[in-house]
From Swiss-Prot:
Protein name (record): Uncharacterized protein YNL011C
Superkingdom field: Eukaryota
SS bond list: none
Miscellaneous comment as given in the Swiss-Prot or TrEMBL entry: Present with 1100 molecules/cell in log phase SD medium.
Gene3D superfamilies recorded: CofD-like domains
GO molecular-function term, one example from the UniProt record: LPPG:FO 2-phospho-L-lactate transferase activity
Length: 444
C-alpha cells in the first residue's frame, strides 16, 4: 500500500524500517511529510545568518534513509561542541583534508564539497565580528542542504539531490510540508491567553544567557585615557546595531526569535508550559497570524495514499504544523477510502503534559477542522456543515498499554475510531507496529 507519514524528525526515525516494509518492500510508494519550522539547535544559526526554511528534521530523515554508508557518516556528522575545535574542523571539511572524506569516492566528494563550499562563501559574505556564526555542534548535512538550496533556488530540488547522491530508493519521498525558500515560524496560543513564539521556545527553550550591557548604557564617549578593551567593546556595540539589518531575520522580527536556540536539551522537561496549548499557528515577522498553503507535492501524495500515518513525536510542534495547513487538511478529510492512523506517544512531554487520550485526539481534530474552515473561507467556498465526523480525520489509533497517555477505547468506538493496543513493549517498536499497520491495511 502507498503510505504517507506525517511527522517530525527524531522520534519517527526509529520507525522507518516499519514504514519501508509495509510499502517499499511491496513495490509501493512511501512519502514522509516533514515540518520546516524547527528553529532549535544548529539550525537556529543558519536561520539567523542565512535564513530560509528550517531543514533539521528533513536532514535527519534523509540521513536515516540513505543507502550509502559513507554519506550517512558525512551528512550525519556534527562538529565538536568546542568553539575553536568546531571552526577548525569545519575548515578542514571545506578544504577537503578532513578524514571524513577518506572513504568517499573522489567524484562524490567533489560533488558534495562544491555545495559545502557554496555555503561557506555565503557565511563569509555575511560575517560580522560582533556576532559571528557559531559552528558548535553544527550538522554537515544541514550545511549541504542549505548550500544546495541556495545554489539551486529550490528546497525540493536540494532534497532530491541529497537523496539521489545517497542512493535512496526511488519509491521513497521526503517532502517539506511547505515548499518555500523563506523562514516560517510557529506560535502557541495558550488557554490563559499567553503566546509563545518559536518551535524551540515552545518545546525545549534554550537557557538564556544574559548579555552584559553595562558599557552600552554609558555615554558613547572614548576618553583618551580609557582602556583599549572598553574602547573595543563600545565599537563592537555600535557595529552590531548598525549591522543588524543585514542578517537574515529582519530587524522588526519578534525579539524572542532573535535569541539563539543553539544550546538546548531535548531531554530537559523540568518546566511545563504555564497553561495548556489552545492552538498552534504560523506567524509572519510582525507576529501576525498567516495561513500558508501545503506543498502541492504533498497534496498529490496524500491523494494517492492508501494509509496516512500521524506518527509519534511532538504533537504541537512536529505534527500540527503539518496538519494545520488548510489545503492539506482538506485533502486528508476528502480521502474517504484512506486509513488515517494516529500513533500515540508513550510518554508526556512539555507540550502535552496532563492531556489524556481524548483531549490529545480532540486537539488534532479541532486544529484540522479550523484549518479547513479557514481554507474554504479564503477560497470563497460556502460550507453549510463544517461539523465533521471524527473518523473523517482519524480512523485508527495505535497506543501502548503501558504508555503514560491513557486511552479509553469506549469513547473512540462511539466515534467509529478503532483502537489497537500494543502490550509487548514500553515504547513504540518497529516490528510490533508493522504487524498492527498491516492488519489495519487489510481491513475494509
Amino acid at each position: 500500500m502507498n503510505v504517507v507519514v506525517c511527522s517530525g524528525g527524531t522520534a519517527t526515525n526509529s520507525l522507518t524500517p516499519c514504514f519501508s516494509n509495509i510499502s517499499i518492500l511491496k513495490g509501493h510508494e512511501l512519502t514522509y511529510i516533514l515540518p520546516i519550522s524547527d528553529n532549535g539547535g544548529s539550525t537556529s544559526e543558519i536561520l539567523r545568518i542565512v535564513g530560509g526554511p528550517a531543514i533539521g528534521d528533513i536532514r535527519s530523515r534523509i540521513v536515516r534513509l540513505l543507502q550509502d554508508e559513507q554519506l550517512v557518516e558525512l551528512f550525519g556528522h556534527r562538529l565538536p561542541n568546542d568553539k575553536l575545535l568546531a571552526k577548525k574542523e569545519w575548515n578542514e571539511i571545506v578544504e577537503g583534508s578532513h578524514p571524513i572524506w577518506k572513504n568517499i569516492s573522489i567524484e562524490v566528494k567533489e560533488m558534495c564539497r562544491s555545495f559545502i563550499i557554496h555555503m561557506q562563501a555565503e557565511l563569509l559574505k555575511k560575517i560580522k565580528h560582533s556576532n559571528p556564526f557559531q559552528f558548535e555542534s553544527a550538522s554537515i548535512g544541514n550545511f549541504f542542504l542549505t548550500g544546495a538550496r541556495l545554489f539551486l533556488g529550490s528546497l525540493d530540488a536540494s532534497i532530491e539531490l541529497m537523496m539521489r547522491i545517497g542512493r535512496c530508493s526511488p519509491l521513497v519521498h521526503v517532502i517539506p510540508c511547505i515548499n518555500t525558500n523563506h523562514t516560517h515560524h510557529i506560535s502557541a496560543l495558550l488557554t490563559n491567553g499567553e503566546m509563545i513564539t518559536g518551535q524551540s521556545q515552545i518545546s525545549h527553550p534554550s537557557k538564556s544567557v544574559p548579555k552584559d550591557n553595562s558599557i552600552a548604557h554609558s555615554a558613547k564617549f572614548i576618553h583618551l585615557l580609557g582602556s583599549y578593551d572598553d574602547h573595543l567593546k563600545i565599537l563592537l556595540d555600535d557595529e552590531e546595531e548598525e549591522a543588524e539589518e543585514e542578517y537574515a531575520n529582519p530587524i522588526y522580527i519578534l525579539p524572542e526569535l532573535k535569541n539563539s536556540q543553539l544550546h538546548f536539551d531535548k531531554l530537559d522537561e523540568s518546566q511545563n508550559l504555564p497553561a495548556p496549548v489552545h492552538r498552534i499557528l504560523y506567524i509572519n515577522p510582525y507576529g501576525e497570524e498567516i495561513k500558508p498553503m501545503g506543498n502541492p507535492r504533498a497534496i498529490s501524495k496524500v491523494k494517492k495514499a492508501d494509509m496516512v500515518v500521524y506518527s509519534i513525536g511532538s504533537l504541537m510542534t512536529s505534527l500540527l504544523p503539518i496538519l494545520i495547513l488548510g489545503n492539506l487538511a482538506e485533502v486528508i478529510l476528502e480521502s474517504n477510502n484512506t486509513k488515517k492512523v494516529l500513533l500515540i506517544n508513550n510518554k508526556y512531554d512539555r507540550e502535552v503534559f496532563g492531556l489524556d487520550g481524548l483531549h490529545y485526539v480532540q486537539m488534532i481534530i479541532d486544529s484540522m477542522s479550523r484549518a479547513i474552515a479557514g481554507y474554504r473561507q479564503s477560497k470563497g467556498v460556502h460550507s453549510e456543515n463544517d461539523d465533521f465526523e471524527w473518523q473523517d480525520f482519524i480512523t485508527d489509533i495505535v497506543y501502548l498499554k503501558n504508555g503514560e497517555i491513557e486511552i479509553d477505547e469506549t469513547i473512540f468506538e462511539k466515534h467509529s475510531i478503532r483502537c489497537h493496543q500494543i502490550a509487548s513493549s514500553d515504547k513504540m517498536e518497529s516490528e510490533e507496529l508493522e504487524k498492527v499497520l498491516n492488519q489495519i491495511g487489510l481491513k475494509n
